[in-house]
Amino acid sequence: MKESNLVGDIRKLFVDFFIKNGHQLFPSSPLIVKDDPSLLFTNAGMVQFKHVFTDASNANVGTAVSSQKCLRVGGKHNDLENVGYTNRHHTFFEMLGNFSFGDYFKEFAVELAWSFVTKELALNKDKLYFTVYHEDQETFDLWKKISGFSENRIIKIKTNDNFWSMGSTGPCGPCSEIFYDYGEDIEGGLPGTPEEDGARFTEIWNLVFMQYNRKSDGELCALPKKCIDTGMGLERISAVMQGVHDNYDINLFKDLIKVSKKQSGNTNNELAHRVIADHVRSAAFLIAEGLTPGNEGRDYILRRIIRRAARYVYMLKYDGALMYQIFPSLIDEKSYAYMADYYPELINAKDLIISILKIEEENFKDTLVKALPLLEKELVGLSSGGVLPGDIAFKLYDTYGFPVDITLDIIKEKGIKFDEQGFYDQMDKQKERSKLNHSIKSVQQLKGKLWVDIKEHYGGTKFVGYEQYSTRAKVLSIIYEGDKSTEVANVGDRVNVLLDITPFYAESGGQKGDTGVFNVIVRQGKELLSCDDVVEVLDTKKVLDTLYIHECVIKTGSLIVGDIICAEVNCEKRKNLCANHSATHLLHYVLKSVIDRSIIQKGSLVSDDKLRFDFSYGVALTKEQLTLIEDKMFSLIRNNSPVVTHICDLKEAIADGAVALFTEKYEDHGVRVINIGDSKELCCGTHVRYTGEIGCFKIVSEASVACGVRRIEAVTGQHAIDYFREQEKMLHLIAESVKSPIDNILIQIDKLNRNNQELKQKLSDAYFSVINLQGIATDKIGSIDFLYSSLNSVPIDVVRKFINEHLVNDMIMFFSNVVGRNVMYVIGVASNLHSKIKATDFVEIIGEVIKSKGGGNNQLAQISGEYIKEVDVIFHVKNKLINVLRN
């Protein structure tokens, strides 16, 4: 294998060739598509240029080249279940592509393709074949002229395989594919023949000629600006260049599989190693873009990928997490699997990737251990061609969280079919059983129709809360009980109120809604001299994006549709909200600056009394890191930097470095950017004018909330001062309790702890004496010393400690400890006996007798339950031991 045939070198060769031929290099767009709701992930090179293809006449770029990260899991393109079983399917892959947006068309596209494969790649011309759409005589003639091939090497295809379209309407056109012949040793026929599904002839490049626009009636009209979109799978062309027929035999995958085999200690089961190698890449890139395993949307796709790989790790009989040990090859310059030169995000997020892979795989192992034996038991009576009942798969999914796609994987390997309809019938029944969900949905539907009607009638609410805290407004609508309109609300009524204009911020972007009051000032055209009609605003929500709904209670008088009111925001709460929201932006910036630049916001809550910030990070922050964060925050607050807001187009904001959240929806035009020093974020929330208004900042907690997600809770301003005072008060109380001055408190506590430990040891020694005095019986069962005793009210930790200190080889210790009407059984088994019997084995036997459950490990386990005569339990324990020795 030539050194220039490495995957990274082929990528560079492609990119450099097209740059040399006048193309502009575009970096890979993210896998997570943020502006196309029809796609979960980027699945082709043309995705980032979709808007250009649909409006090529106004394109500001003529030609482009890219190597695009792609993921095909879920939706129309889903290769997950095929990975490992075929030579060419991957979840993650790279697509090399060159593009023209009204610049050049077929002839130059064909010339470039021919030049690259025959000169740059130096492929044997005798190994190449072309396909064209059967009505595309122009491309047929171009290939014939440029390549000099005879007509039997240029194959006309009548199917839609050679006609590409973006959808049922829109840009479309014929395409031409380049095929590589692997030779007669491999089965398969030419494209268009009955044997075309064989592996001999492999498509290596697809050239799409977008020359038509398909109308809704199916008519094809010529596009004013014709475009080129090509795609060449990097892994597939690498296999050709490296002289192998299987993508998993290229250097990149061989290195990943090599590490998988070495770390697992299992060189067999090639299928498992292939799946693991593929899924490590997919998971790593998704985590690098900020995803964490979850139960919905893209997060669930990531979880499925990791769990599918974890199941194959389990098949290797490897006792531990494996994926995180394979990932470092992707960022190791000495490895053929090295990808971080082109995708530095892998290095930036390496700690997070390693942490999430390890934690998620370890967590799923528990599910596998419980669920797999149950599935295997159900499959015992099924032979190849049999059908697994859908209710069994549903039980595994519903009770144990065992993904149905993994069940499908397992039965596929055994040639067993799946009762898919039965599975979904059970899913439907579960939904029907959930009356709560049904009722909530019904209410939402009623509310939804009401608000749609209101929006159609009145339009959206004008929000003026960025500039002012109060305004005159007109009451447009009053709603009660969620879905009923009324003209009048009286004292004590709780209602939702819609105004034509409001200074009240509606909850969104993590920020809580404003509270405050309405005072009626004009009724039926008459100015009111006194404020007898007062409405308290408890919260403000947003419905259908533009309706600001005020949740209110009538405190005095009444409220009538048509009233003119003075709407006043609670200024103190709003100022606290502003301080906490600006502090959240600064915290995001500081975390990226001083902890890890790959950190991504996963969620936030901004209320008037605290802020909460969730972020992607795999391990707990140290005390030193938390102090560093606070110091940096204090510095930014003291700088008293101005908070600058400006409005611009979304693309302009992103290009300028503004942080956007994939969980939020943004308009293409008129997005709001908040600049606080070097922090830039798209945000619709309210903020302070200067950072000094935040006052101070204190972290009150830092903890894990999900796999790979940490949460910081903090307070600012007066709430931070109150927190400091509470801590000081607590310190004084502790000092009084331990009878020590504050500056000597740690020494005094240390002294008390030492005294406490000495007393605990004396108490433990006393209980040890009690255990010995109560008597320990010994039976010889084979070569094993079986020691047992009945105790009364001895602390369980003392019993466990006694066993740990006295257990020796060839010994089993069994203690019952009666406390009131309950009894605790503790069993210790010497380590040299674990191959025959474990402490948890006895727990299972005792559990059957006393109808209870326990736990522990191989050496020490315990179980408690209602007291039963001692002899009964000891009999079962001894009987279990005798049966083990006999077998």
From Swiss-Prot:
It is an enzyme of class 6 (ligase). One of its GO terms (biological process) is alanyl-tRNA aminoacylation. It catalyses: tRNA(Ala) + L-alanine + ATP = L-alanyl-tRNA(Ala) + AMP + diphosphate. Binds 1 zinc ion per subunit. It comes from the Bacteria. GO terms for cellular component: cytosol. Its cofactor is Zn(2+). Keywords: Aminoacyl-tRNA synthetase, ATP-binding, Cytoplasm, Ligase, Metal-binding, Nucleotide-binding, Protein biosynthesis, RNA-binding, tRNA-binding, Zinc. Zn(2+) binds at H581, H585, C683, H687. The keyword Phosphoprotein does not apply. InterPro entries: aa-tRNA-synth_II/BPL/LPL, Ala-tRNA-lgiase_IIc, Ala-tRNA-ligase_IIc_anticod-bd, Ala-tRNA-synth_IIc_core, Ala-tRNA-synth_IIc_N, Ala-tRNA_ligase, Ala_tRNA_ligase_euk/bac, Thr/Ala-tRNA-synth_IIc_edit. It is found in: Cytoplasm. Its EC number is 6.1.1.7. SUPFAM superfamilies: Class II aaRS and biotin synthetases, Putative anticodon-binding domain of alanyl-tRNA synthetase (AlaRS), ThrRS/AlaRS common domain, Translation proteins. HAMAP family: Ala_tRNA_synth_B. PANTHER family: ALANINE--TRNA LIGASE, CYTOPLASMIC, ALANYL-TRNA SYNTHETASE. Consists of three domains; the N-terminal catalytic domain, the editing domain and the C-terminal C-Ala domain. The editing domain removes incorrectly charged amino acids, while the C-Ala domain, along with tRNA(Ala), serves as a bridge to cooperatively bring together the editing and aminoacylation centers thus stimulating deacylation of misacylated tRNAs. Catalyzes the attachment of alanine to tRNA(Ala) in a two-step reaction: alanine is first activated by ATP to form Ala-AMP and then transferred to the acceptor end of tRNA(Ala). Also edits incorrectly charged Ser-tRNA(Ala) and Gly-tRNA(Ala) via its editing domain. This is Alanine--tRNA ligase.
